[in-house]
Amino acid sequence: MFLPLPDDFHAHLRQGELMPGYVRDLVSQFGRAIIMPNTVPAMSSAAAIAEYKRQILEAAQDVRPDFEPLMTFKLNPNYTEKDLKDMMAVGVVAGKYYPAGVTTNSADGISDFEAVFPVVAMMEKLGLVLCVHGEEPGEFCLDREPAFIKRVETLAQKFPKLKIVFEHLSSAKAVEAVKRLPANVAATFTVHHLMMTLDDVVGDALRPHHFCKPLPKRPEDRAAIREAAFSGSPKFFLGTDSAPHQQGKKECPCGAAGVYSAPVAIPLLVQEFDRAGALDKLPDFIAGFGADFYGLPRTTKQ
């Protein structure tokens, strides 16, 4: 069986001396990827994004010189339409909504939901995609994603022409919400949420390398994710949320959230789709539906 060259619609590459290795791991498996903006400082200007893109392309040269990084900016209420157009000119395709404090490098995230509506309206006008980390701050950890569904529903209602990606779904309630929301709302699934429950994080033993945000949840939540992923619905596609951290930041008293899956994501997906008797659905999941939703041409490479 030959697979199309996959797209990853949610990847973290970090910064500094370790970044080139993370890039090489990613591009060994993927031809395109949505690059997350929660760096320090955040990706929030055309100049910073252009330089980050240059570094990524430089690191990719030895492995996949035609790799295409699809850039994003970190949403805040202060952008002008010119800012957005300038960022689009250097390769930005989406903005990322991080609620304040819910995940890595999100302390400067959104604390006033409606304050970003003017910027979101500009994004809708310009055809930018809104990617959402859907967890409600202050809720019990397993309830944060279900509690955020109302925010996505509000965005979909208020901005009907805006494409919204509810990222890395981890709950049956969120899966059902995406199914019933209009066609301008889609979702990504990670490999680890397809495979794990909370037992795999804190069940018989504490497994820090399985710790991520949003947390894997109950078996019935995983079952809903798997059913949707294997269904062939164009609303669901791959975003690995591959998130590298140094070993000392995972194996410590206060470990960082993130599963580093880039080097093994595609073999694991082949395994899981095969076990489910759904290998015929895998090409669209990894290299079709996401491109369609983002308005990109489907890859012709294998």
Region spans (language model):
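Short helix-capping segments at alpha-helix termini
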Residues: 57-67, 157-161, 182-183, 278
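Glycine-rich loop at the start of a catalytic domain that most often binds anionic cofactors/ligands
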Residues: 46-55
